[in-house]
Amino acid sequence: CMGRESWTRVTGLPAGPGGGTFGLPGGPVDRAQTDARSDTLTFTTEAFATPHLLAGAVRLEAEIATSMLSYDLHAVLSRVTEKGAAYPLAEGYATLEPGHVTVPMRATCCTLQPGERLRLSLSPACFPCFPVNPGTGAQQPWEASLADQNIITLRLSRANSRLHLPMQPVASGPGKE
C-alpha cells in the first residue's frame, strides 16, 4: 500500500555488513554492492548544495510490521560520493518485535561536501557478525535449527518512521574557515 516499503530476508543468503563497525575489513569500505541487494532497503537524499556538518549520535525510529514474533534490523548511514560509492558513517543493530522500534546508531562526525548524499540502508540481517534471527522469538537465535529459520518480510511505514541526524549547515563567509 502507499506509504509502506517492504523487503524480505531470504534465509540461505543473509545480508552482511559491508565495512563499517561490524564488517571485515572494517571502516570506510564502499558498501554500494551490499546496498544493491534485494534484501536491503535504501533511502538516499538529494545531493547537498552546500557543506553540512554531521556530528553526534544518529537514531532511527520506525514503525515496522511483520508476521514473525521477532526480527533483526541492521541500520547503516552512509556518505555517498558523486561517483556512487557508499562509505558507512554510523550503524546500529537490534533484535526487535513488530511495532514502533528505536535503533540507536553509533556517533559520527564528518563534513558532507556539495554533491555528496546520505543513504540509510536497512537489512534484516548482519551475518556473520550476528546470528540469523529465525523469527520465532527465541531468546538465543543460534540455538534454532536451520529448519526453524523463516523467510521474513518486513513492512516499514514511511509516515511513522524518522531518522534523527545531528546535522547543520557549515557556516561560510568572511572570518569563517
Listing of model-derived features with the role each one plays in the protein:
Residues C1-E177:
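Glycine/threonine-rich phosphate-binding loop and adjacent beta-strand/alpha-helix elements that clamp
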